[in-house]
Design a protein with these regions (language model features):
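N-terminal glycine-/charge-rich "phosphate-binding" loop or analogous flexible N-terminal tail
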Residues: 1-41
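Phosphate-coordination loops involved in phosphoryl transfer and adenosine-cofactor binding
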Residues: 4-5, 80, 130-133, 215
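Short loop/helix-cap segments at secondary-structure boundaries that form the rim of catalytic
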Residues: 19-23, 35-38, 52-56, 71-79, ...
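Phosphate/diphosphate ligand-binding glycine-rich loop within oxidoreductases
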Residues: 40-113
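Glycine-rich NAD(P)-binding loop of Rossmann-like domains
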Residues: 112-145, 174
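Conserved beta-strand positions in the Rossmann-like core of class I SAM-dependent methyltransferases
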Residues: 158
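Rossmann-like adenosine-cofactor binding region
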Residues: 164-259
Length: 308
C-alpha cells in the first residue's frame, strides 16, 4: 500500500540548517517544499510565520521551534490546524542563566573584576546560596528542571502554579496556588517567572505583588507581558526588589529610550536565556512527525484557549 505523502515548509531563522538536518533524517513519506500553498506541515519560528500564515491554507500541523507561540495565537483566532511547541530542552539553559546571575550577584564577581582593573585589593561580604528561598512561578518542564538544579546547591525551591499541586516527582519543597503568593513572598529571596503570556498572567507582576517582596532578586525568563514596567521600576526604587534580571520584554528589541538600559539595578539580556538549537528541535519534530503520520496524538500540543 502506498502511504500518503506529506509536504513540509520551513519558516525558520536558519532554513538551510534545518533542511540539512531533516535531509539526513530521511523521514518516511515527507517531502520538503518551498513557501507555498501545498504544505500540510510547517516547521516555523512563530514571529517569522505569523505574518505569512495565510500563505498556508492547507496546513494541518505547525511545529514551533520556540516554546512560546504567542505570535501565532494572536493570528489564529479560529484554529484550523494543530500547533505544537518544543518542551524539555530549555530547562538546563534557563537554570544556567538563573544560577549564573544569582551567584555573580551574591558573590560580587563582576565587582572583583572591576577592582582588578584598578589594582584594588578589597574584600566584600557575600552570601551563600544555601538556605535561600526561590519562588518559581510555573511548575512545568522548565520550572521543575530549575527546582531540581537549585535544590542541589542548597536553595529551597517553592513552586507556584494554577492548582497548588506539585508535579509528580518534583523537587519543590512547597507548592502554592497562584492566588496564595502574597503572604509567601515576604519570606523568599529570589523570584523566577517562567510563565507564559495568558489573560491570567498578563501584568501579574505588578505593584500589589511587589509590595510583599523584601529585597528579592527578580528574574523574568517567561514572557515580557507578565510584568508591569512602571510597577517594577517603583519596586526597585522602594527596595522591594534588589535587582531585576530581564530576558523577555513586551516589545523586542526594547526601545533606545527604555529606562531599563541605564538602570543600575536592572540587567537586560536580549532574549538569550534559552535558545532553540536546531538539532534538538529536529529531534522533537522527527518523533512527532512519526506519531502524526501513523495517526497518533501529537506531543506538546498547545491549548489555544489556555495559550500554552
Amino acid at each position: 500500500m502506498t502511504m500518503q505523502k506529506h509536504t513540509l515548509a520551513l519558516v525558520t531563522e536558519d532554513n538551510d540548517k534545518y533542511l540539512s538536518l531533516l535531509t539526513q533524517r530521511q523521514l518516511p513519506d515527507l517531502e520538503i517544499c518551498g513557501v507555498g500553498q501545498s504544505a500540510s506541515i510547517v516547521l516555523a519560528a512563530p514571529p517569522k510565520l505569523a505574518d505569512s500564515l495565510d500563505c498556508y491554507p492547507e496546513v494541518q500541523w505547525i511545529q514551533s521551534t520556540y516554546a512560546g507561540v504567542d505570535a501565532l495565537l494572536e493570528k489564529a483566532n479560529t484554529p484550523r490546524f494543530q500547533l505544537t511547541n518544543v518542551k524539555g530542552i530549555f530547562g538546563q539553559q534557563i537554570s544556567e542563566y538563573v544560577l549564573g546571575h544569582t551567584i555573580n550577584h551574591y558573590r560580587h564577581f563582576a565587582l572583583y573584576k572591576q577592582q582588578q582593573t584598578n589594582r584594588d585589593w578589597q574584600q566584600h561580604h557575600y552570601q551563600s546560596l544555601n538556605g535561600k528561598r526561590m519562588a518559581i512561578f510555573g511548575t512545568g518542564a522548565i520550572g521543575s528542571h530549575l527546582a531540581n538544579v537549585v535544590k542541589a546547591l542548597g536553595i529551597i525551591p517553592i513552586g507556584i502554579n494554577r492548582t497548588g499541586i506539585p508535579p509528580r516527582q518534583s523537587a519543590f519543597a512547597e507548592t502554592y496556588h497562584i492566588n496564595e503568593v502574597n503572604t509567601l513572598l515576604t519570606s523568599v529571596d529570589i523570584i523566577v517567572s517562567t510563565l507564559p503570556n495568558t489573560p491570567e498572567t498578563h501584568g501579574l507582576f505588578n505593584g500589589d505583588l511587589f509590595a510583599h517582596c523584601r529585597g528579592v532578586l527578580f528574574f523574568n525568563v517567561g514572557r515580557g507581558a507578565t510584568v508591569d514596567t512602571p510597577s517594577l521600576l517603583t519596586a526597585l526604587e522602594a527596595g522591594q526588589i534588589d535587582h531585576a534580571f530581564l530576558d523577555v520584554f513586551i516589545n523586542e528589541p526594547i526601545s533606545q529610550e527604555c529606562p531599563y538600559w541605564h538602570h543600575s539595578q536592572v540587567t537586560v539580556t536580549p532574549h538569550i536565556a534559552a535558545l532553540s538549537f536546531p538539532e534538538q528541535v529536529v529531534d522533537i519534530f522527527a518523533e512527532n512527525y512519526l506519531r502524526w503520520r501513523d495517526g497518533f496524538q501529537l506531543q506538546n500540543l498547545v491549548d489555544f484557549d489556555k495559550g500554552y
